[in-house]
């Protein structure tokens, strides 16, 4: 630690709401919400298909325990380790994206996104997103001047993103591609790159996105059903219409925990991608807004921590925190928007809430990294404050 760093003394200020407790409390609240809602949403399906009503909830409790354990490990890893390990993390991220396309990968519903690891299947896009954001955060810090003032410096990280995006689209995992590219672009923008630099990129991505939709029949059907789900409510629009019915049944305060009808084999993926619709059905619009508010508080606390780190001169910690926060916020926002019909179906889980081991553990690691950044910033502020106090003790400084 550098004792001479001069930063504002934030902690302990009367009446100021600290972001770290907010980050932890909202994360735990969402984690508990997820376990409760998976218990409700999955019981009937688990009983009918697996003969054990508690199959999914028991596994989710185990995943939650593993997530908390990995978070405790991650919060004790210095931020400098992530910065030094950028190339290693990039290699891991790209390697898992390649391995899933080999016979090691597992295909479910036409998508090859998982590698079996015994207890659970690792969704490689979750691992890759965190690894790539860590590498790109390091690049932004190391090559800041080149990134800000030259086109080659700006295009190099986009090349890395391009390779990862191609590997994700091959799986195919279009939703993860959107989240990764948008979060990375947002992180680079927050580092100081002019918005005008992104305009050509936005145009290219829009063109590529259109091509991907038009050339893949299932994506085209999703877009068409998104525009008018009731036109084909028993085929391409089925999932969205059932989700909207769940929201309608919930009204203001819901039908009560465990009383959902849509989870009874009407709404596919009720315990994963569309768990937000079950929350809305059982707890109503008010319950859905509470979950939305928890995610908003989590994202704001993450951004505040990143901003404080930036002011304290912790460039990598700030950039990495921005990236992780954007990953979580974008995925949550897209998932909830899909459930309400604001976006086409993407196949993304709701972070910390939906069933799934790899997504949960990677999210817990990301939150732990943000917490570590804030703890290191507080440590710097305390050392700086103590040093300043020692230098001015007695009202004078003597050589």
UniProtKB/Swiss-Prot annotation:
GO molecular function, one term: peptidoglycan glycosyltransferase activity
GO biological process per UniProt: cell wall organization; FtsZ-dependent cytokinesis; peptidoglycan biosynthetic process; regulation of cell shape
Keywords (A to Z) from UniProt: Cell cycle, Cell division, Cell inner membrane, Cell membrane, Cell shape, Cell wall biogenesis/degradation, Glycosyltransferase, Membrane, Peptidoglycan synthesis, Transferase, Transmembrane, Transmembrane helix
Origin superkingdom: Bacteria
Gene symbol of the encoding locus: ftsW
Reaction(s) catalysed by this chain's protein: [GlcNAc-(1->4)-Mur2Ac(oyl-L-Ala-gamma-D-Glu-L-Lys-D-Ala-D-Ala)](n)-di-trans,octa-cis-undecaprenyl diphosphate + beta-D-GlcNAc-(1->4)-Mur2Ac(oyl-L-Ala-gamma-D-Glu-L-Lys-D-Ala-D-Ala)-di-trans,octa-cis-undecaprenyl diphosphate = [GlcNAc-(1->4)-Mur2Ac(oyl-L-Ala-gamma-D-Glu-L-Lys-D-Ala-D-Ala)](n+1)-di-trans,octa-cis-undecaprenyl diphosphate + di-trans,octa-cis-undecaprenyl diphosphate + H(+)
Cited function: Peptidoglycan polymerase that is essential for cell division.
Primary location recorded for the protein, binned into one broad class: membrane
HAMAP family named among the record's database cross-references: PGT_FtsW_proteobact
Official protein name in the record: Probable peptidoglycan glycosyltransferase FtsW
GO CC, any one term: plasma membrane
Family: Belongs to the SEDS family. FtsW subfamily.
Membrane topology, from the record: Multi-pass membrane protein
Keyword Hydrolase recorded: no
Pathway, per record: Cell wall biogenesis; peptidoglycan biosynthesis
PROSITE patterns: FTSW_RODA_SPOVE (PS00428)
Organism: Marinobacter nauticus (strain ATCC 700491 / DSM 11845 / VT8) (Marinobacter aquaeolei)
E.C. number(s) listed in UniProt: 2.4.99.28
Places the protein is found: Cell inner membrane
Bilayer-spanning residue ranges: 19-39, 61-81, 85-105, 114-134, 160-180, 198-218, 285-305, 314-334, 350-370
Phylogenetic classification of the source organism: Bacteria, Pseudomonadati, Pseudomonadota, Gammaproteobacteria, Pseudomonadales
């Amino acid at each position: 630690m550098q004792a001479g760093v001069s930063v504002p003394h934030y902690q302990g200020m009367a009446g100021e709401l600290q972001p770290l407790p907010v980050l932890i409390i909202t994360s735990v609240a969402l984690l508990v919400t997820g376990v409760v809602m998976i218990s409700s949403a999955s019981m009937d399906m688990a009983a009918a298909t697996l003969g054990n009503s508690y199959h999914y909830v028991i596994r989710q409790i185990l995943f939650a325990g593993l997530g908390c354990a990995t978070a405790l490990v991650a919060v004790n890893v210095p931020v400098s380790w992530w910065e030094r390990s950028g190339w290693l993390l990039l290699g891991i991220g790209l390697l898992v994206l390649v391995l899933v396309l080999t016979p090691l990968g597992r295909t479910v519903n036409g998508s090859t996104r998982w590698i079996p690891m015994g207890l659970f299947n690792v969704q490689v896009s979750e691992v890759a997103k965190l690894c790539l954001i860590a590498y790109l955060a390091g690049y932004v810090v190391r090559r800041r001047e080149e990134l800000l003032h030259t086109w080659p410096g700006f295009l190099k990280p986009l090349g890395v993103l391009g390779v990862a995006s191609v590997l994700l689209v091959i799986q195919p995992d279009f939703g993860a591609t959107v989240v990764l590219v948008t979060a990375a672009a947002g992180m680079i923008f927050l580092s100081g790159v002019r918005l005008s630099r992104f305009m050509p990129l936005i145009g290219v991505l829009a063109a590529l996105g259109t091509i991907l939709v038009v050339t893949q029949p299932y994506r085209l059907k999703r877009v068409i059903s998104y525009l008018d789900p009731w036109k084909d409510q028993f085929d391409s629009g089925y999932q969205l219409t059932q989700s909207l019915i769940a929201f309608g049944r919930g009204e203001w305060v819901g039908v009560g925990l465990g009383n959902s009808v849509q989870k009874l084999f009407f709404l596919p993926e009720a315990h994963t991608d569309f768990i937000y619709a079950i929350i809305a059905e059982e707890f109503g619009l008010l319950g859905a807004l509470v979950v939305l508010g928890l995610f908003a508080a989590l994202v704001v606390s993450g951004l505040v921590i990143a901003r404080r780190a930036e002011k304290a001169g912790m460039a990598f910690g700030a950039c990495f925190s921005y990236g992780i926060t954007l990953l979580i916020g974008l995925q949550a926002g897209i998932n909830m928007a899909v459930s309400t019909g604001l976006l086409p179906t993407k196949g993304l889980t709701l972070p910390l809430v939906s069933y799934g081991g790899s997504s949960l553990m990677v999210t817990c690691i990301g939150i732990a990294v943000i917490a570590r950044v804030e703890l290191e910033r507080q440590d710097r502020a305390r050392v700086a404050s103590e040093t300043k106090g020692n230098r001015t003790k007695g009202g004078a400084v003597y050589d």
